Amino acid sequence: MGRRQARETALQVLFQIDLGKTEPDLALNNTAEEFGAGPQEIEFARQLVMGTLEHIEEIDAMIGKVSKEWQLNRMANVDRNIMRLAIFEMNYRADIPKSVSVNEALELSKIFGTPDSVRFINGILGKLLDNKDEAAPVISSLE
């Protein structure tokens, strides 16, 4: 299991938390066990989940600023959480290139989303990359 699988695990955990208000550690342990994740992958998935949850209000505000046509609560749960995960990486993980975060989000959307998910997620993430002022003050501090 590599970083992509760790991201898949993180997405599934965020999805469970979003739907069922499951405790993050319980959801992470159950999901990681189900997929046979190793210690490094579990740790990376944990960092992604906990970081996303820690900054979820800011991340949701970023999405809201660029998705004027769609309210966050009307977006598909999977799409919403793929974007949250990618935006966390883009803004709060300087060790991960933004292009990698976007590409990984698009790959996740191909696996877990609908046929329209890739285009929708790419559009939102692209707007955030193009409009750094719309995103967050954190972006400028990372560059």
Swiss-Prot record:
Gene3D superfamilies the record matches: NusB-like
SUPFAM superfamilies: NusB-like (SSF48013)
BP term (GO), one: transcription antitermination
A cellular-component GO term for this protein: cytosol
Sorted UniProt keywords: RNA-binding, Transcription, Transcription antitermination, Transcription regulation
Single GO term (MF): RNA binding
Record carries keyword Transcription: yes
CDD domains referenced in this protein's UniProt entry, alphabetically: Terminator_NusB (cd00619)
InterPro entries to which the protein is assigned, alphabetical: NusB-like_sf (IPR035926), NusB_fam (IPR011605), NusB_RsmB_TIM44 (IPR006027)
Record field: transmembrane: none
PANTHER family the UniProt entry points to: ANTITERMINATION NUSB DOMAIN-CONTAINING PROTEIN (PTHR11078:SF3), N UTILIZATION SUBSTANCE PROTEIN B-RELATED (PTHR11078)
Described purpose of this protein according to its UniProt entry: Involved in transcription antitermination. Required for transcription of ribosomal RNA (rRNA) genes. Binds specifically to the boxA antiterminator sequence of the ribosomal RNA (rrn) operons.
Family: Belongs to the NusB family.
Protein name per its UniProtKB record: Transcription antitermination protein NusB
Biological source species: Desulforamulus reducens (strain ATCC BAA-1160 / DSM 100696 / MI-1)
